[in-house]
Amino acid sequence: MRHYEIVLLVHPDQSEQVPAMLERYKTLVTAANGKVHRVEDWGRFQLAYMINKLAKAHYLCLNIECSKETLAEIETGFRFNDAVLRHLTVKRDKAETGPSAVMKRVEKEEARKSSQQETAA
């Protein structure tokens, strides 16, 4: 089995469906004897350029271990899901389990915002 990192850009109006989407993709991987090593919800970010007349998207990151057939099935699901604006799959040498650089930045910004709210109150 191979290790993959998948980054998804989801339509911002479909943000409430993100947990269900993640659960569906995790179920696909585990049903095919694969493993899910890391799932990160990075939140909404500004896009570098407009995609389908949208300036923002909801970002997700999955690190999985599965066969290439399972990956093909997952990517086919991305293509037929209108909520997925873009996806990128990268083959990794080993499983990534720690927080990604983007997730560290998101957590740092959330901590900064909460400390500012505490000092303002």
UniProtKB/Swiss-Prot annotation:
InterPro entries tied to this protein: Ribosomal_bS6, Ribosomal_bS6_sf, Ribosomal_S6_plastid/chlpt, Transl_elong_EF1B/ribsomal_bS6
Gene Ontology cellular-component annotations: cytosolic small ribosomal subunit
CDD domains attached to this UniProt entry: bS6
Family from the record: Belongs to the bacterial ribosomal protein bS6 family.
Keyword Signal appears in the UniProt entry: no
Superkingdom: Bacteria
Function: Binds together with bS18 to 16S ribosomal RNA.
Coiled-coil stretches: none
Record protein name field: Small ribosomal subunit protein bS6
Keywords: Ribonucleoprotein, Ribosomal protein, RNA-binding, rRNA-binding
Gene: rpsF
GO process annotations (BP): translation
Segments of skewed composition (Basic and acidic residues): 104-115
